[in-house]
């Protein structure tokens, strides 16, 4: 009986301060291990969502092309493309905090809203009077958001990725099934054929790296920046999310 009472007293005394501190320490260690894992998983989920959105943009542009036998560009972009080496045009370079050069020889800089209003059949901008989409077909189904900083298509009609970066979109405006992008055509970025690009001998080197696709879509990714003086496989460019890779 004495043994039983002693055992009961031991079971009922609760945790000591030292035991509580040990438990708290273990919880802290587990939390410190869990937070980075959750952060990494969240980042990967956003990257996956961005790739899905890029695929949606490319598909919408291709469907538009199939219907109209042209790309959904504004007249200003089409005119600028003629003067660009390679004859292509990059949307999405306007209003960026990171300097992304327009194509050499191009006199026009635009964000991707010009494409979005055409693809979504919105009666504004270059699509006023539905001039560029007379069938008023909604080719793109994307999330509309209030404001101009959230992921999705904002009130300015700019399409931003899950990291809140505007998508940069290059089109094969001369219909040769090869596309030059204002950023990725640069020798400093793509030398060696990084991201599956090749040097197009039809355009004089340097800065003649191109993709064998009619549409290139990309964004800055998690770090929200890119550097035209650094290679594509190093920071800050290595986390850029691209559609053609």
Enumerate the predicted regions with their spans:
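N-terminal hydrophobic or amphipathic segments with adjacent small-residue motifs
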Residues: 8, 19-25, 63, 158
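N-terminal pilin/flagellin-like segments and related low-complexity appendage regions
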Residues: 47-245
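N-terminal leader/signal peptides at the extreme start of proteins
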Residues: 1-15
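N-terminal single-pass transmembrane signal-anchor helix
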Residues: 12-41, 54
């Amino acid at each position: 009986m004495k043994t039983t009472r002693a055992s009961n007293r031991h079971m009922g005394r609760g945790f000591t301060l030292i035991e509580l501190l040990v438990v708290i320490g273990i919880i802290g260690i587990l939390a410190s291990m869990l937070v980075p894992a959750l952060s990494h998983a969240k980042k990967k989920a956003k990257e996956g969502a961005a790739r899905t959105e890029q695929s949606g943009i490319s598909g919408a542009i291709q469907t538009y092309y199939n219907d109209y036998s042209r790309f959904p560009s504004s007249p200003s972009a089409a005119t600028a493309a003629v003067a660009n080496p390679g004859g292509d045009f990059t949307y999405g370079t306007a209003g960026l905090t990171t300097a992304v050069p327009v194509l050499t020889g191009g006199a026009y800089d635009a964000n991707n809203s010009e494409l979005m209003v055409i693809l979504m059949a919105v009666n504004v901008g270059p699509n006023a009077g539905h001039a560029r989409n007379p069938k008023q077909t909604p080719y793109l189904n994307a999330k509309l958001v209030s404001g101009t900083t959230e992921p999705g298509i904002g009130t300015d009609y700019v399409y931003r990725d899950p990291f809140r970066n505007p998508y940069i979109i290059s089109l094969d405006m001369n219909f040769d099934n090869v596309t030059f992008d204002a950023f990725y055509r640069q020798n400093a970025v793509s030398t060696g054929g990084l991201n599956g690009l090749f040097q197009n001998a039809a355009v004089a080197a340097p800065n003649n790296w191109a993709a064998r696709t009619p549409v290139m879509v990309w964004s800055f990714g998690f770090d929200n920046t890119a550097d035209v003086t650094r290679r594509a496989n190093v920071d800050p460019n290595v986390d850029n999310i691209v559609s053609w890779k």
